[in-house]
Amino acid sequence: MSTLSPLAPAYLALRNEVERVVAKLAPIAVEADSSSGLHPDVLAILRESGLFRLMVPAAHGGRSETVDPVAVCVVRESLMGVCSAADSLFALQGIGSFAITIAGTPEQQAAWLPKVASGEVLSALALTEPVAGSDLRSITTTAEVEGSQVRLDGRKSFISNAGAAGFYVVLAKEGELGLSAFLVPADTPGLTVEPSVELGAPHLLGDVTLENVVLPISARIGEAGKGLEPVLSTLAVFRVSVAAAAVGLAQVALDEATRHARTRVQFGRPLLRLGPVAGLLADSWADVESTRLLTYRAAELAREDPRAHLEYSSLAKLAATEACSRVVDRCVQVSGRWGLVRDSRLERCHRQARPMRIYEGASEVIRLGIARQLAAEVN
């Protein structure tokens, strides 16, 4: 990590800890990143590392009093640089459980968060549907309250960790009240999982069908009709960590291309001494350093108050993922045919960079939100 983004000693120690985990992941990274399923060795390494504890408050087995976005960013930057499957699995453990952390009942928290911290169970956030992607208000899954119970019906699509998760946080429309969130254990009768269309994503995906799923009303997370609140808080904390993962991926691509440009001789000199190549690498370094600075500043703000500073998490995610795509593309260009060798580090970077501009807020949707915020602030 660049010295332009100074970290407190505790975060430096965490980074060193993660580097030891990364060393264990490196030998299996190519295999894990090429799989669309859950890689058991990656899960075992993460469980043993204790890193999942960063996703849960100390009261339920976590490492710190609250989930710390800066710590999550430190981990994701390092993991993504080596194994995107590990990065995804780590991030999803927090994304799927954070609604319980901040809005769950004491009983929900006690039942599930210690298992999240240990990695005994995986978590999943079930938002998207065949007709509802970025526009969550178009969700059609229904929640009908019947006395002391609630019945869920609907279909969720492209759900990360589907089929492996121990529970799902499901967003559903509760009549005229609006969207509510519910905690649905994976073994609940009426919940079934089917494989999704295979995507260029290094983690398990599936479609979740809820057919006459009956739960106690105590399965609701937070207040009725206010299910978007914990979801938005989840985005506020974890969106900035996508930026950190993008920075980590861009840094690795830059390192690979720079090593190649130093040693590859053409026209009697190393590529690095050819003006056009030098310019590509210089621009890439500027992209990496500037987005890293923005990312960690946004993470610090998210640590103070995630919802109050959501626009900065969004800015960081937009800037870093777009920059990552530019950097990786330049680095492949610098490396020529060697950057296209299947399963080489640069070719994997090329595959892994593209989805980051779509998940956890497509760039276009984020731009729209940022523009609205800007318009509201400028009189």
Positions of predicted regions on the chain:
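A short core secondary-structure module
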Residues: 149, 155-192
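Flexible, small-/acidic-enriched active-site or ligand-binding loops
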Residues: 187-216
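Long, acidic (Asp/Glu-rich), low-complexity accessory segments flanking structured domains
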Residues: 212-230
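Active-site-adjacent elements of ketosynthase-type condensing enzymes
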Residues: 131-142
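Alpha-helical interface subdomain recognition
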Residues: 1-81, 106, 115, 119, ...
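N-terminal glycine-rich flavin-associated loop
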Residues: 84-107, 133
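Short glycine/proline-enriched turns and hinge-like loops at secondary-structure junctions
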Residues: 66-67, 135-137, 161-165
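A short, Trp-centered hydrophobic/proline-enriched beta-strand micro-motif
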Residues: 119-127
